[in-house]
Amino acid sequence: MPRRPKKPLPKVSRNYREIIADELLAFWASLVSNWIFILPSILVIVALVHLVRPMPPATVRIATGQPNSTSEVIGQQFREAFAKHHVKLELIPSSGAQDNIKLIESGQVDAAFSQGGVDLGEHGGVLRSLGSIAYQPLWLFYRGPEVKQQDLNHFLKDRTVSLNIPGSGSRVLAEQILQAHEINIDTPRFVTMNASDSLKALHKGEIDAMFVVAGMESRNVLDLLESPGIHVFDFNMADAYARRFKYLDAIVLPRGALDLSPVSPSTNINLLATTVDILATDQLHPAIQLLFLDAARNFDEKRTTFFSMDGKFPTYMDTRIPESEVARRFFKEGTPFLWGYAPYWIASLFDEIW
């Protein structure tokens, strides 16, 4: 029986291209013939979007802190992250975390870096938390011979100590700890000066010790940690403080965390830590909130971790302040599915609609 000649296979890829081309031409023809109906519809949709949610501002202000502080350093990194989305982030210097609360409540800034435990004032209800992004230990730096396992009352006796300045988070936390020890700070031994001046005075021997609340990003902290003859007080009762003050955690700076040759620190150091928090008003545009949250996540991914409990940020910790709805979705689901593929404000809009 003679074989039947084989039929050539259809050129599938060519057929698909022709079908797609035909569909696109038909779609274009439909647009051209019905533009008088389609264009007004598009304009109405755009107008509704603007009415329901205005465009995000081109400039945002955030209160940071003192020069060389953790908040200033983080703010500079956030400013670069915002610039990638063509948003200008203005860094507004301040006395510190407590002062930042006043700035945001008075409307002078749109957002602020703060810390757990600061007084929220009478208008705390308008604040929303965008989460905690890092630990900020309470450091007690001192000069002279290294002291081990000493009670704070005994350690501070006859020492001249800087408590930082009113309005700073360092001052707030230092006063709370000293009050718990029933230490009277209204004496000449306790002086008032900002972190930079305290650092200089400690180096010169004009004071014996200084309190400062700051993360490892702070240039002041790095300067002091690298200075010969300057030591860190070991808060050996850190667990007791953490039980008394709910906004504090007991953390450890592990032996060798700073350097392995020579080993620095030479032993584990117990510290108390609050957190760096991002606060905003309940009126801050949701798309701008997403920029802050994304910048916080990128900051955490790129930074070096030093402390024993450093791997849980960013997260919501200070429950005194309501968590923003945008932050709640972000911590649960991450960035919107259009993030990185569309302008940030469109990704934010679809995130809420979806």
Which sequence ranges carry the predicted segments?
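N-terminal hydrophobic or amphipathic helices and topogenic motifs
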Residues: M1-Q98, E105, H123-V126, G131-Y135, ...
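Solvent-exposed, acidic/flexible segments
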Residues: P67-G75, P93-A97, L130-A134, L163-A174, ...
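Sec/Tat-exported extracytoplasmic proteins
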Residues: F82, H86, Q108, F113-G116, ...
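Bilobed "Venus flytrap"/periplasmic-binding protein-like clamshell domains
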Residues: P57-H85, W139-K204
